[in-house]
Swiss-Prot record:
GTP binds at residues 357-361, 376, 399-401, 450. Involved in riboflavin biosynthesis. Catalyzes the conversion of D-ribulose 5-phosphate to formate and 3,4-dihydroxy-2-butanone 4-phosphate. RIBA2 and RIBA3 together are not able to complement the loss of function of RIBA1. InterPro entries: DHBP_synth_RibB-like_a/b_dom, DHBP_synthase_RibB, GTP_cyclohydro_II, RibA-like_sf. Its EC number is 4.1.99.12. D-ribulose 5-phosphate binds at residues 130-131, 135, 245-249, 269. Its cofactor is Mg(2+); Mn(2+). It is found in: Plastid, Chloroplast. The record marks 231, 269 as: Essential for DHBP synthase activity. This is Monofunctional riboflavin biosynthesis protein RIBA 2, chloroplastic.
Length: 476
């Protein structure tokens, strides 16, 4: 693939850049097929076949103009960093030279997209380094009674329909609980359940469920077309899809959009014959027996990040801190315009064994430091300074889980100040913005500073891996 390199003197920050927008496959300008850059003191690379989802750390600059090989620019995967003229920055090779190549034992994403387009189901595994749970997924607009009978026979019976927020709002389907009150393990965004009023009886049969799903998928449906509660469970899709949250909800809609269909999909977890959740070996056997494509969310992440981005680099500057000097790398979210900061210490080099902390913004903790969140921020920065090499990613705004200011003081009455949950760490499935930032900084293998025992899913899709975890010990 190609690379775009701009080298200018490093005496000024990036003043301006003109972007010619391209296609918008997911409703937001995530793909930039052409980039026209004015003079600025930044080195930029269009990274071959690279792109993005998680969080943490990551030539001298005489003016040379532009070196361009054009075939890669269409994917819009642009990384950029300000570089002092006195520093050398080694090129980081992409270990995953072909982001379209599926993981061994899995079908390719284009094969799955083609099946979705023709109304077939695919089996999607959430993360092969996690629990390997699999979902049956198909386009909601192509649902049939026969397909629903198959889903109910081989699934949990909880049939869900993943939808975008604007469609849920159009149908007046609110979340079952508010986001801050969502205690479900994976923070899946369930809305109230529904049945279609027309063409159904009890709502539970395969035919009735198919009718409800088709009604949900129809652009002509209205709020009054549904009974509440019912037997189909709509789920709210996170904008940005698997590049934002590495879950089945997002994967299912991404697949239907890539197939050129309405952004509404059916999904149901697969169970084994004994009623337990089917794991990867059994899922592979199940897919073969039923002639279904088996894909992983990690592969879908790789497929999308080759073509799209969620963040763009804006500037970098040296910043003195109470712990020592760092470089602040600023990135802007293309989803909501929120700017995030990566505080980098030392040289990323080969990207291995990097000490990393991903921290969600919390004003009361971070500024006033009265709870574990502020203490953990300070400890993480100190550890990075002592280590001489590391990255602290500070995710702002919506990335901090949308916690309102009134909610935080109420947590002080719960006696849970010692738990990391009070500091609102980023959910393990919602590292999309941070993962792209880390990848752009050159991070490949990291030691994550966290007190959270949860596994982080979807990292493989970004070429990221965790070599260890470092606890952040705070004192009362």
């Amino acid at each position: 693939m190609a690379s775009l390199t701009l080298r200018c003197d490093s005496t000024h920050l990036l003043p301006s850049r003109d972007v010619v927008k391209g296609t918008k496959p997911f409703g937001t300008s995530l793909v930039y097929p052409r980039i026209i850059s004015k003079k600025f003191n930044v080195r930029m690379r269009v990274i071959p076949e690279e792109g993005d989802v998680f969080s943490s750390s990551k030539s001298n600059g005489s003016s040379m103009g532009i070196e361009l090989q054009p075939d890669l620019v269409s994917f819009g995967t642009l990384a950029a960093e300000m570089i002092p003229t006195t520093m050398d920055s080694p090129e980081v090779e992409d270990e995953e030279f072909d982001l379209d190549r599926p993981t061994d034992g899995f079908a390719s994403i284009p094969q799955a997209i083609e099946d979705i387009r023709h109304g077939k189901m695919v089996v999607v595994v959430d993360d092969e380094d996690r629990e390997n749970e699999g979902d049956l997924i198909m386009a909601a607009s192509l649902a049939t009674p026969e397909a629903m009978a198959f889903v109910v026979k081989h699934g949990t019976g909880i049939v869900c329909v993943s939808m975008k927020g604007e469609d849920l709002e159009r149908l007046e389907l609110p979340l079952m609980v508010t986001r801050k009150d969502n205690e479900e393990k994976l923070r899946t965004a369930f809305t109230v359940s529904v049945d279609a009023k027309k063409g159904t009886s009890t709502g539970v049969s395969a035919r009735d469920r198919a009718q409800t799903i088709l009604t949900l998928a129809s652009k002509d449906s209205k709020p009054e077309d549904f009974n509440r509660p019912g037997h189909i469970f709509p789920l709210r899709y996170r904008e940005g899809g698997v590049l934002k949250r590495a879950g089945h909800t997002e994967a299912s809609v991404d697949l239907t959009v890539l197939a050129g269909l309405e952004p509404v999909s059916v999904l149901c977890e697969i169970v084994d014959d004994d009623g337990s959740m089917a794991r990867l070996p059994r899922l592979r056997q199940f897919a073969q027996e039923n002639n279904l494509k088996l894909i992983s969310i990690a592969d879908l992440i790789r497929y999308r990040r080759k073509r799209e981005r969620l963040v763009e680099f804006t500037a970098v500057a040296p910043i003195p801190t109470m712990w020592g000097p760092f470089k602040a790398h600023c990135f802007k979210s293309l989803l909501d315009g929120v700017e995030h900061i990566a505080m980098v210490k030392g040289e990323i080099g080969d990207g291995k064994d990097i000490l990393v902390r991903v921290h969600a913004e919390c004003i009361t903790d971070d500024i006033f430091g009265n709870s574990s969140g502020g203490k953990q921020l300070a400890i993480a920065m100190r550890l990075i300074e002592e280590n001489g090499r590391g990255v602290f990613v500070y995710l702002r705004g919506p990335e901090s889980k949308g916690i309102d200011l009134s909610h935080k003081p109420r947590t002080y009455n719960t006696n849970s100040d010692q738990a990391e949950g009070v500091s609102f760490p980023v959910a393990s499935r919602e590292y999309g913005i941070g993962a792209q930032i880390l990848r752009d900084l050159g991070v490949r293998e990291m030691k994550v500073m966290t007190n959270n025992p949860a596994h982080y899913v979807g990292l493989k899709g970004y070429g990221l891996s965790i070599s260890g975890k470092v606890p952040l010990i705070t004192t009362p």
